[in-house]
Swiss-Prot record:
Key words, A-Z: Aminoacyl-tRNA synthetase, ATP-binding, Cytoplasm, Ligase, Nucleotide-binding, Protein biosynthesis
Cellular compartments annotated: Cytoplasm
Protein name as annotated: Glycine--tRNA ligase
Listed SUPFAM superfamilies: Class II aaRS ABD-related, Class II aaRS and biotin synthetases
This protein's record includes keyword Heme: no
This protein's record includes keyword Cytoplasm: yes
């Protein structure tokens, strides 16, 4: 058994992870969290909440997982959320084209076109691993689970592929909550769905998974000189830049460069201070939940693998024994792509008014309608036209004026109808105006976390074996059971004292487990295996001097303290 198999065996035995639908044969891409796994995962999430909600001042929302078609059409997911698919001509089994190539040839398929993938399959004579048959042509497969809303299937929808869109859709409400003052951030934690073609990587590649995403809305002019960056600029991180990835003269080790965030921004490796800051926040979070720092790196996306919405993106990748480096966090500059897309498709104004440092004199177009002609032509819709003209930005106004001058007409599209405007319907003249602010479409920095992958890596990085025990060396922040409480023997009042102590620990918010079965050494081993950092034993001395033995998991050190000091001692150590 390799390390992965040992961990999966332990997690199944001890109630961390179980195959979903197991009594019906199971389905690839789905896992259940058992009692200890659910606590572990929630501890990871709550630590994440501490970093983003408590420390960073974001607020959390909770939106539906079923998402109307038009939302994901506007966001680009209907067109772009795809993977390359190959299907066997003989057995009709489907596979990810890029994965099947990498399993047979030592080559990186990241960013390759469908044609390039097809050529690789043909050149290397790659066959179906199930039956040895030939593959059909490589095609694209949309990863979203399709569904419908209501009877009759009239309202097309999808299970959401990411939690982020719920935040963008509610941007106006969120902005009002923050009194329309940039910058501000919102987070959402919940299920997302991707209909993976052939998930064969256990808990690493799931069809239903938990995301924790933050959307930080900021004036694009503030990204370069981000106020909070000063506090993290000297943090040194292992960076794998896009430039180094493409430099074939460098070895794999040479491509990763350790440098401060300050130098990375200064040298143009990281786009700006705002994205660098959230890379630092990500590192702090991963360290607190027990990720091995030597198994962490930050890799920049290459241009040909960048998401359709991103201007720059860095992945926090964690090393695993079986699967190598896996992407667990993406920190992306989504620019104003999403807000612009939803503005265009919903006709809602998703801009924010920002005050200028000083008053500014600008030239703007002033529109004067020929109300007689407009009223005769558009009748009851004249008011809609007037309001729509007021909402036009400078670029659209320039476009309108130029079209009327050169072509004599212009079609203005609104959410209610299209207006075909003729030159005689209005006059537009430039006037000077003093303004105290302006409307902008905020840019978005998005830290997006795959909670399930992170939780698995927490388990793998915590897993240790020696001659006589297996240990899950969880950090205090995430360990599911905080204290094991044991009576040395089941007599002389020791069980009653132990049970009373367990109840006091629980009353103080600590999950404590009572165990009176087997030799004390076996009980320690059971607690080590599930990552419990402290064990307390009630023994003969407890009956005479009210002291107990505390045993620490990692050092195995044992010492005595008064029983009435156990709760404050452990709370202090855990914090």
């Amino acid at each position: 058994m390799d390390k992965y198999d040992k961990i999966i065996d332990l997690t199944k035995r001890r109630g961390f992870l179980w195959n979903s639908f197991e009594i019906y044969g199971g389905i690839a891409g789905f896992f259940d969290y058992g009692p200890l796994g659910a606590i572990l995962k929630n501890n990871v999430i709550n630590t994440w909440r501490k970093h983003y909600i408590v420390n960073e001042g974001f607020y959390e929302i909770d939106s539906p997982t079923v998402t109307p078609y038009e939302v994901l059409k506007a966001s680009g997911h209907v067109e772009n959320f795809t993977d390359p698919l190959v299907e066997c001509k003989s057995c009709l089994e489907s596979f990810r084209a890029d994965h099947i190539i990498e399993e047979n040839v030592d080559v990186d398929t990241e960013g390759k076109t469908l044609q390039e993938l097809q050529e690789m399959i043909e050149k290397n004579n790659i066959k179906c691993p199930k039956c040895g048959g030939e593959f059909k042509e490589v095609s694209t497969f949309n990863l979203m689970f399709a569904t419908s809303i209501g009877p009759g299937g009239k309202r097309a929808a999808f299970m959401r592929p990411e939690t982020a869109q719920g935040i963008f859709i509610q941007f106006k409400r969120i902005s009002q909550f923050f009194r329309n003052k940039l910058p501000f951030g919102a987070v959402q934690i919940g299920k997302a769905y991707r209909n993976e073609i052939s998930p064969r990587q256990g808990v690493i590649r799931l069809r239903e998974f938990t995301q924790a995403e933050g959307e930080f809305f900021i004036d694009s002019r503030k990204k370069e000189n981000f106020e909070k960056f000063e506090s993290v600029k000297e943090i040194v991180l292992p960076l794998l830049s896009g430039k180094n990835q493409e430099n074939e003269s460098l070895s794999a080790e040479e491509k990763i460069v350790r440098m401060s965030l300050s130098d990375a921004v200064k040298n143009g490796i990281i786009a700006h201070e705002a994205i660098a800051y959230y890379i630092a926040v990500t590192k702090k979070f991963l360290m607190e939940i027990g990720i091995d720092e030597s198994k962490l790196r930050f890799r920049q996306h290459l241009p040909n693998e960048m998401a359709h919405y991103a201007a720059d993106c860095w992945d926090a990748e964690l090393y695993t024994d079986r699967y190598g480096w896996i992407e667990c966090v993406g920190i992306a500059d989504r620019t104003n792509y999403d807000l612009l897309a939803h503005m265009k498709n919903s006709s809602e104004d998703l801009s924010v008014f920002v005050e200028l440092d000083e008053d500014k004199e600008i030239e703007v177009y002033e529109i004067e309608l020929n109300y007689k002609l407009v009223g005769r032509t558009f009748k009851g819709d004249s008011k809609v036209l007037e309001e729509s003209l007021k909402e036009l930005d400078d670029k659209k106004m320039e476009e309108l004026v130029e079209a009327l001058e050169t072509e004599g007409k212009y079609v203005l599209s609104t959410c209610k109808r299209d207006f075909e405007l003729l030159k005689e319907y209005l006059t537009a003249k430039k006037v000077k105006k003093t303004v105290k602010g302006e409307k902008i479409i905020p840019h978005v920095i998005e830290p997006s976390y795959g909670i399930d992958r992170i939780t698995y890596c927490v388990m793998e990085h915590a897993f240790k074996e020696d001659e006589d025990r297996t240990v899950m060396g969880f950090s205090n922040a995430v360990s599911p059971i905080k204290v094991g409480v044991f009576p040395l023997v089941n007599k002389e009042g020791m069980p009653e004292i132990a049970m009373d102590l367990k109840n006091k620990l629980r009353e103080n918010g600590l999950i404590a487990e009572y165990d009176d079965s087997g030799a004390i050494g076996r009980r320690y081993m059971r607690m080590d295996e599930v990552g419990t950092p402290f064990c307390v034993t009630i023994d003969g001395e407890t009956l005479t001097d009210s002291s107990v033995t505390i045993r620490e998991r990692d050092s195995r050190e044992q010492f005595r303290i008064p029983i009435n000091e156990v709760v404050p001692y452990i709370k202090d150590k855990l914090n």
